[in-house]
Amino acid sequence: MGGAGDLNLIYAAVRLCGARRAVETGVAHGWSSLAILAALAENGGGGLASVDMPYPKMHNEPFVGIVVPSGLRENWTLIRLPDRNGLKQAITRFEGSIDFAHYDSDKSYYGRKFAYPLIWQALAPGGVFISDDIQDNMRFAEFVAEKDISFAVTECAGRCVGICRNS
């Protein structure tokens, strides 16, 4: 199970864009879920649909999302499917339009090639998209170049994070 990521960045992005509908991939212990849900609560409410691939042989089911307190869980939907099915389901939960997305799951080039366009197509104007670990391959750089998207890159714990806003 993965680490926490840049929780301050995630929280601030959700707050600053005024998100009400959020999607994330890659839950693990739920640190990013907690940051998103806390920011949504400060924004006056909203919902988070999180996609996390089950790993039955790891016996980690009881620990997925464990840090999310019960008071924030009512606005949280946890979808235990691989990205290819789960991401579509998460976006559909918000009728195809989201304000914030955090991608932290399939790090492969082809995983990102599948997910990024789905996320971007659903991202409402003013919405923010964050992708963790973009140094793993060139897909984030290619995606923002193909779509002519303004972006920023930051670093957290030695890993690169890509950020862009739908204008």
Model regions and ranges:
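S-adenosylmethionine/decaboxylated-SAM
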Residues: 4-167
